[in-house]
């Protein structure tokens, strides 16, 4: 039985050593964990401080830039106001002249267009009458001697189109 006691003793001893090593490892891990927590907290606090400083600096710069912009805008407004009062009448006159020119050009175009449309309408009318006469003649519904009332009395016209080639340099 001594051997059984000896085994029991050795098992207890091994168990005690294992518990001691586990305790040491847990202590070491706890220390490392605490150190990591402390380091993380320091880093976060430092980053927060840096962000606050950066934000304050940006705020100051923005405020200063806004003030400068406002001053320059006021100066520009003053300069523009005097320039506009000097040139306002000239601009008004140029606008009036441009409107007058546009009106005259539109009237000339209207007159020219109405003449062309009148001629075109007459030509279309004559072409339709000619086509009607040709169909009647083809179908035998018309003879020049028997149906003089259906013969077109409109003068025949010939249209010539001239095209010019424009050469660009």
From Swiss-Prot:
Subcellular location: Cytoplasm, Cytosol
Region (Disordered) location: 1-117, 139-169
Gene3D superfamilies the record matches: Apolipoprotein
Keyword Cytoplasm: yes
UniProt organism field: Arabidopsis thaliana
BP GO terms, sorted: protein stabilization; response to cold; response to freezing; response to water deprivation
Role played: Involved in dehydration and freezing tolerance. Protects and stabilizes the enzyme activities of ADP-glucose-pyrophosphorylase (AGPase) and glucose-6-phosphate dehydrogenase (G6PDH) during drought stress and freezing. Prevents aggregation of leaf soluble proteins during drought stress. Does not stabilize liposomes during drying and rehydration.
Main location: cytoplasm
Compositional bias segments (type: Basic and acidic residues): 12-23, 50-62, 89-113, 142-151
Top-rank taxon, per record: Eukaryota
Induction comment: Induced by abscisic acid (ABA). Induced by drought stress.
Keywords: Cytoplasm, Stress response
Name of the protein in its database record: Late embryogenesis abundant protein 7
InterPro entries listed in its UniProt record: LEA1/2/D7/KIN2
GO cellular component, one term: cytosol
Tissues in which the protein is found: Expressed in sepals, petals, pistils and stamens.
Annotated family: Belongs to the LEA type 4 family.
């Amino acid at each position: 039985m001594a051997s059984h006691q000896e085994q029991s003793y050795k098992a207890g001893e091994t168990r005690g050593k294992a518990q001691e090593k586990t305790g040491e490892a847990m202590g070491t891990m706890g220390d490392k964990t605490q150190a990591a927590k402390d380091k993380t907290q320091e880093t976060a606090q430092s980053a927060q401080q840096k962000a606050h400083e950066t934000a304050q600096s940006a705020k100051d710069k923005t405020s200063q830039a806004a003030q400068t912009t406002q001053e320059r805008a006021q100066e520009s407004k003053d300069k523009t106001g005097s320039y506009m009062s000097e040139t306002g009448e000239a601009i008004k006159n140029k606008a009036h002249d441009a409107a007058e020119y546009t009106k005259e050009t539109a009237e000339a175009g209207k007159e020219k267009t109405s003449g062309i449309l009148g001629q075109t309408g007459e030509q279309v009318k004559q072409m339709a009458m000619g086509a009607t006469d040709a169909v009647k003649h083809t179908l035998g519904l018309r003879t020049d001697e028997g149906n003089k009332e259906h013969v077109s009395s409109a003068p025949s016209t010939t249209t010539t189109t001239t095209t010019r080639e424009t050469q660009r340099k």
